[in-house]
Structure formats: structure tokens, C-alpha cells
């Protein structure tokens, strides 16, 4: 068959040249027998109509429950990290995702890299609704949302934390927020 005759056949709508077949799904004999048996036995339809739709879910619920990884009621983990470069920061984010508290000691890093690291981890902590505190000079605590971070300082009468039940608490000596490297100057444009 030539190319022109094939084009004419396609444009004219000759279906025998189409390689696609209509595949109709006809019920098998077993399926037909099941349908006929169900129609003949009205007890099945009444039982289905009178049944509670929530019973099915309650019966199978215990088999579908899956525990969250990294959560344990007995203890909590704290990861102490002393990174030397920014390349080690994804490990801290992974620890936060595993619901571990991370203490970063950034004294070994270049100040610019340390600021970048704090910003990166602070963003990850914010994304998981966690908490962050500055513990000391270049030392920061980042905790997931399941951990209460309580700070006690003489200036504050009440702890600065979000309380939830059955979560471990870590106390810090002082509540100060991290300052960016460019915020070290005491000058203000509005003074």
C-alpha cells in the first residue's frame, strides 16, 4: 500500500487500518453467577442496608495504625554537633526531622559560614514548627515541636515556651535570640 493510499484511508476514516482494538470488558461467568445469587437472595441486600458503615472501619483500624518513626515516649535524644563547614548542615536538619534536639557549636566555623548555617537550620526549624534558642556565644539549640524549651532568666518571671503534654523539657541559662552577623553594630537609623 502506498503512502498516498494510507493517507486517504486515514482521512476517509477507514477503521481497519487502525491498530487499536476496542477492548470490552465483559463479566465472567463467575461474576454473573454472583450477581444473580445476590439478586435472588434479598437477605444480603437487607443486611447491607441495615449494617453500620463505620463497623468496617472500626474492625480494620487496629491493623492500619503505623507509628511515627523517631517518636518514643520514654526518652528523647540530643545531638551535639561541632561542624567545620556548611556542608555538614543537612545532617542537623535530618536530626531535627527525626525529632532529635540539636545543639550547634559553631566556634570552629568562619563567622560568615556560621551565620549562613544558623539561618539554614533556623529555616528548617521554622518549617517543622520547632524552637530555637541561643545558648551562648556561637552555640545554638534547635528543637523540634515535640520538645519544650524552657528558659529561666532573672528578667523574666515566666518561662518562654510552648507547653505540651508528655514532652521532655530542657532548661537554658539565658533567653537570647540569635543575632545576625550584620546586626552586631549598636547603631540604629531611627535613633
From Swiss-Prot:
- Ranges where the record places region Disordered: 150-191
Entry keyword set: Cell cycle, Cell division, Cytoplasm, Septation
Please provide an example of a Pfam family that matches this protein in its UniProt record: SepF
For bias type Low complexity, the affected ranges are: 150-164
Q: Where is the composition biased (Polar residues)?
A: 165-178
Q: Name one GO biological process term.
A: FtsZ-dependent cytokinesis
Major site of localization recorded for this protein: cytoplasm
> Record's Gene3D superfamilies?
SepF-like protein (3.30.110.150)
Q: Where in the cell is it found?
A: Cytoplasm
Q: Per the record's keyword annotation, is Ion transport included, yes or no?
A: no
Q: Name one GO cellular component term.
A: cytoplasm
Superkingdom per UniProt? Bacteria
- The answer, when asked if Ribosomal protein is one of the entry's keywords, is no
Query: What does it do?
Result: Cell division protein that is part of the divisome complex and is recruited early to the Z-ring. Probably stimulates Z-ring formation, perhaps through the cross-linking of FtsZ protofilaments. Its function overlaps with FtsA.
The entry assigns this protein to a family as follows: Belongs to the SepF family.
On subunit structure and binding partners, the annotation says:
Homodimer. Interacts with FtsZ.
Designated name of the protein: Cell division protein SepF
Amino acid at each position: 500500500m502506498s503512502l498516498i493510499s494510507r493517507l486517504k484511508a486515514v482521512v476517509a476514516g477507514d477503521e481497519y487500518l487502525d491498530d487499536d482494538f476496542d477492548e470490552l470488558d465483559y463479566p465472567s461467568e463467575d461474576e454473573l453467577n454472583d450477581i444473580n445469587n445476590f439478586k435472588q437472595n434479598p437477605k444480603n441486600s437487607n443486611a447491607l442496608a441495615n449494617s453500620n458503615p463505620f463497623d468496617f472501619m472500626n474492625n480494620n483500624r487496629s491493623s492500619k495504625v503505623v507509628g511515627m518513626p523517631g517518636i518514643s515516649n520514654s526518652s528523647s535524644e540530643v545531638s551535639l554537633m561541632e561542624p567545620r563547614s556548611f556542608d555538614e548542615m543537612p545532617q542537623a536538619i535530618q536530626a531535627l526531622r527525626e525529632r532529635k534536639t540539636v545543639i550547634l557549636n559553631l566556634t570552629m566555623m568562619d563567622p560568615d559560614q556560621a551565620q549562613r548555617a544558623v539561618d539554614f537550620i533556623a529555616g528548617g526549624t521554622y518549617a517543622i514548627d520547632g524552637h530555637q534558642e541561643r545558648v551562648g556565644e556561637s552555640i545554638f539549640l534547635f528543637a523540634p515541636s515535640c520538645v519544650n524549651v524552657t528558659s529561666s532568666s532573672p528578667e523574666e518571671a515566666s518561662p518562654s515556651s510552648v507547653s505540651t503534654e508528655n514532652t521532655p523539657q530542657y532548661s537554658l541559662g539565658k533567653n537570647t535570640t540569635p543575632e545576625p552577623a550584620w546586626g552586631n553594630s549598636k547603631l540604629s537609623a531611627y535613633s
